[in-house]
Amino acid sequence: MMIPPRERKPRQKRITGFLIRQLFLMLLATVSMQAQVTLSDWTQIQIPPELTGNQFSPTRMAVNFFGDLYLLDEERSLIARLPADGDNVRIAGGWGETDELFTSGSDLTAAPGLDVLIVDSDTHRLLKFDRQLNFLEELNLLSTDRPVEFPSAVVRNHAGEVLVASDSEADLTLMNMSGTVISVMGGENYGTDRFVDINSVAINSINEIGLIDSDDRYLVLSRNGRMLWRGSLNMELKFIESTGNEWLVGTAKGEFFIVGQDSQAEVLQESLTQWTVSDMAVGNDTVYILEEGSGHIFQAQLRYAE
């Protein structure tokens, strides 16, 4: 039997009301999020003389679980460890193509675990050091199951697997330290989600992968490369780090945003940065930024309002 049109109206109202309520809750969640995350005042970290001036010019940075900072000098092919207590600075590396030497270090990672990894772009190698920067081993990325040319970024997940970005192919290769390839992500089979220009890569506590691609978009994938979600901001994004269940993305101007699957909000800062950021790292809710040119390092605390 046909239902008269007048009997359908209450149901339509209920559906419309439900949708409006859901949209309101989503908006409320976003607004709440915007008010929850702030950054404390930036403070400068004192750097020993041997890591300044004509001796060392950091261009990339990483931090481990203990708060030790690792600095990469691409021009001089050097890596330095600045312990959390500021004592016993160590410098390793040097120009060369074997063992701890490298010619064009493009990225480094220090967490999770105690090891430090560097990718050397021109020699297509992955170098492994211990926490004190004693050289352990190297892996020729051209000799793996699926060769990786000109590595540009490296991160390590909590299972001990390594994710390496290729500058020539604009893809990500997940492998173990023996060189066995587990999966390759971001190629032609990703269709419109195919990677174009990988700027930054990070991994969170549940081994999800976050990356900045083509400046303005961020993508989140599962450990095996399945696309989980994506988003974009109308600005040039350069950095991504994990924080809790969400992601912190940043620009070279020192603007930061907390992004999730259904939300994005600017991180309010008590004091705005006045410098150009060349790299960013996050450890234990502390954000570290490296100033381009001077090599100065600043830190601030992420604060979450209850």
Question: What kind of region is each of these model predictions?
Answer:
Residues Q36-Q55:
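A short helix->beta-strand "capping" segment at the edge of beta-propeller domains
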Residues L78-A80, R125-L127, D171-L174, R217-L219, ...:
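A short loop-to-beta-strand structural motif that recurs across blades of beta-propeller domains
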Residues T52-F65, T98-P112, T144-H158, Y190-S205, ...:
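Beta-rich, blade/repeat-based domains predominating
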Residues P83-D87, D130-N134, N176-T180, S222-G225, ...:
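Short loop/turn segments that connect beta-strands within beta-propeller blades
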Residues L71-E75, I118-H124, V164-A170, N204, ...:
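Conserved beta-strand positions in repeat-built beta-propeller and related beta-rich domains
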